[in-house]
Amino acid sequence: MQKNKIKATLQAGGSVLGTCITDCLNPEIVIAVKAAGLDFFFIDGEHARASLLDVQNFVRVAKSSGVVPLVRVPQSEYFFLAKTLDCGALGIINPRTESVEEVEKIVSCMKFPPKGRRGYGLRSIVTDLDFKGAAAEMKSADEESMVIIQMETQPCVDAIYEMVAVEGVDATMVGPFDLSVSLGIPGDFENPIFWKAFDRMVDACNKVGVAPGVHFGSTKMLKRAQDHGARFLVCGTDMSVLQNGFTALVGEMDIRSDEPATAGKSGGYM
């Protein structure tokens, strides 16, 4: 099975940087991700339209490019968790995780017996037709796959110390917008309430060797989160990178300076 370089880096105390794929579902984009020097990407299966076929196509290119493919699933159901791994993802990001019981369920669905209850269905996308035997393949899959839980609600903030202490959790990823909404301060990332919750998550992670993480839409905010201790770092989306690049191109060429912009700033994680 493909080695998970970002898992090894995080376990050694390092930091990793990636982005989110939402709309540009041509796997050629993985080549650009690699060329840019990013460590990983995650396909958004919660909010966007990506299918398991898209996941598998991206995984094929990622494996040959040395980029780590992750997927955010819609919810913590066995079907989504296990089948996404069977399609070759090296890690799962689970949204809106809120309790110890849910974390235990996620780990159980993602790990083979005796650690969990994942069914054996390792396909060529995982083994590359180089079968080493069931025991060896299951051991490798358990070792290389990543469990990443999202902190996006007040209940998660309240239970975060117990949640990240569940054996098998590798990293967290704060969803800033959902978290700020749950905290009663929608989109207000200057509010100390937000950073108090964020720092609580970082402290909880550091106590048990889990990598604290976040997905922000700008490098400015991501650097701020990094200063607060985040190490699993995600910035922007495919569409935000395209828009920012095109906007910079138009601004630098300055051939239509008398014409007003046709669109405002993109929102959310854009």
Q: Where are the model-predicted features located?
A:
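Catalytic cores of alpha/beta
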Residues: 31, 35, 76-90, 94, ...
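N-terminal amphipathic alpha-helix/helix-capping segment at the start of soluble metabolic enzymes
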Residues: 1-20, 129-143, 199-200, 206-207, ...
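Alpha-helix-loop-beta-strand connector modules within alpha/beta enzyme cores
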Residues: 52-86, 108-115, 139-142, 190-213, ...
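Conserved N-terminal beta1-alpha1 strand-loop-helix module at the mouth
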Residues: 1-69, 75-76, 108, 147, ...
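Conserved anion-binding
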Residues: 79, 91-167, 261-270
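Glycine-rich phosphate-binding active-site loops on the catalytic face of alpha/beta enzymes
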Residues: 91-105, 172-181, 230-249
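Extended, intrinsically disordered, low-complexity segments
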Residues: 237-241, 245-270
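Conserved beta-strand positions in the central sheet of alpha/beta enzyme cores
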Residues: 18, 41-42, 93, 173, ...
